[in-house]
């Protein structure tokens, strides 16, 4: 975990510190540890989509809880990333309903188009690909989450088109500066 990145310290910027304090105030003083999920999410967003050990420690200290408890939360939920990820995190649900509707083929399309496998990031740091557990949208399987957006009722052609849209977005941004 995070062994490649050393000498990294985390602190909320002023805006996020104010937001964190507002979040904590929503809980009674004796229950402020309940703010762990939103604060870890806030830290992850500030840090480019992943949680360094120092970010987990910072949040634990802010909530006056043992680091290990905060670490347990960060490692339990798949929404937290403990290593750097690409700008776009493509998460393919591969649990039974999505698998029955072709999520394995969706995963293969992603691997082919991006030339990466599960838990890998493209060399340009634009995309990370992950297989994940249920996204809770089984009625519209198969489902893919890219950052905060859900894409439902996918098939191979739709997934290829979706990846092309993200790839073309990068090409146009690079050309337009």
UniProtKB/Swiss-Prot annotation:
Documented EC number(s): 7.1.1.-
Cofactor binding, note field: Binds 1 [2Fe-2S] cluster.
Keyword vocabulary terms for this entry: 2Fe-2S, Iron, Iron-sulfur, Metal-binding, NAD, Quinone, Translocase
A GO MF term: quinone binding
Entry binding sites for [2Fe-2S] cluster: 93, 98, 134, 138
Catalyzed chemical reaction(s): a quinone + NADH + 5 H(+)(in) = a quinol + NAD(+) + 4 H(+)(out)
One Pfam entry name: 2Fe-2S_thioredx
Cofactor: [2Fe-2S] cluster
Coiled coil: none
Top-level EC class: translocase
The keyword Metal-binding belongs to this UniProt entry's keyword annotation: yes
Family: Belongs to the complex I 24 kDa subunit family.
Primary role: NDH-1 shuttles electrons from NADH, via FMN and iron-sulfur (Fe-S) centers, to quinones in the respiratory chain. Couples the redox reaction to proton translocation (for every two electrons transferred, four hydrogen ions are translocated across the cytoplasmic membrane), and thus conserves the redox energy in a proton gradient.
PANTHER family to which the protein is assigned, alphabetical: NADH DEHYDROGENASE [UBIQUINONE] FLAVOPROTEIN 2, MITOCHONDRIAL, NADH DEHYDROGENASE UBIQUINONE FLAVOPROTEIN 2, MITOCHONDRIAL
Name listed for the protein in its UniProt record: NADH-quinone oxidoreductase subunit E
Species: Rickettsia prowazekii (strain Madrid E)
Lineage: Bacteria, Pseudomonadati, Pseudomonadota, Alphaproteobacteria, Rickettsiales
Record gene name: nuoE
